[in-house]
Every structure is written in structure tokens, then in C-alpha cells.
């Protein structure tokens, strides 16, 4: 299992959006977790936000060293393969309203049949959502996922 240090800063703003990391910074915080693991150092969301670029509404422009997958076909198997390589996976899902949320998938502790509930997550917005199924219960549409 991979572990990270994560916190949502309340006052640090996202680009020129006027919104704070606590309000719209789940993607920034998830990238900070991913980069903390990749570099072996602790990178906090406020420091990460200064390294990233954002649209005027606060949407992040993804780091170029990350590969995006937008096809949800076979996503559990693909994510499992990345975890077996020792790489966490950043995962985004949406509500029917279009609202998005981002988490980091850190491991798999389910059985031999892959299920969303078997994937452990670090959720920058909730300590109660601890597996991928918890996220999909609230954000049922898979948006995309990233890995490095």
C-alpha cells in the first residue's frame, strides 16, 4: 500500500479563480499526493498550486509527465496493473450535475475478482470515503484517470 500526507489549505487560492484549495482544490491536492510519492518528498497542496497552471475558472492544466486515460473500458484492470508497478493512480469522477471530484487510488486489498470496493483511496475531501466504490456512490460517472 502507498501512503501520503494530504491536507487542504483553506486560504491558498487556485490560480486567478478566487477560489481556495479547500473549495476546489481536490485535483491540486491529489497531484500533490502523486508527486510526493513520485519524488519521495512531501509536497503540500499550497506548494503544488504554485507549480501548476490553471484556467481562469480554476481547472488545472495537467503536468506533461502524466498520461490521461478517458476510456473507462476495463478501468479496474488497468488501474490494478499500475498499482502492481508501484504507481498510484489519480482518479476523477463526476455527478450528473457535472461536479467533479479527484482522489488517489493507493492500493488494492480486495479478492481475486477486481471490484471498485477493493481499491483503497486517499480522498482529499473526505476521510469517510476510503475505497473507490465510496467515491463512485457519490460521483457515479468515471471522468478520467491519470498516472505517471
Region locations from a protein language model:
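Active-site signature of cysteine proteases
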Residues: 35, 39, 96-148
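Hydrophobic/aromatic residues in well-formed alpha-helices
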Residues: 48-50, 79, 135
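Structural recognition of the beta-strand scaffold that forms the well-ordered cores
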Residues: 25-28, 88-93, 104, 119-122
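Active-site-adjacent structural segments surrounding the nucleophilic cysteine of cysteine proteases
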Residues: 1-52
Amino acid at each position: 500500500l502507498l501512503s501520503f500526507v494530504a491536507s487542504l489549505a483553506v486560504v491558498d487560492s487556485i490560480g486567478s479563480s478566487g477560489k481556495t484549495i479547500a473549495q476546489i482544490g481536490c485535483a491540486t491536492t491529489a497531484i500533490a499526493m502523486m508527486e510526493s510519492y513520485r519524488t519521495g518528498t512531501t509536497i503540500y497542496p499550497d506548494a503544488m498550486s504554485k507549480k501548476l497552471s490553471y484556467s481562469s475558472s480554476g481547472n488545472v492544466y495537467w503536468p506533461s509527465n502524466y498520461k490521461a486515460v478517458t476510456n473507462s473500458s476495463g478501468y479496474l484492470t488497468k488501474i490494478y496493473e499500475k498499482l502492481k508497478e508501484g504507481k498510484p493512480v489519480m482518479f476523477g469522477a463526476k455527478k450528473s450535475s457535472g461536479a467533479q471530484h479527484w482522489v488517489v487510488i493507493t492500493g488494492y486489498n480486495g479478492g481475486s475478482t477486481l471490484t471498485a470496493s477493493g481499491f483503497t483511496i486517499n480522498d482529499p475531501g473526505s476521510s469517510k470515503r476510503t475505497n473507490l466504490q465510496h467515491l463512485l456512490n457519490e460521483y457515479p460517472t468515471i471522468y478520467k484517470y491519470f498516472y505517471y
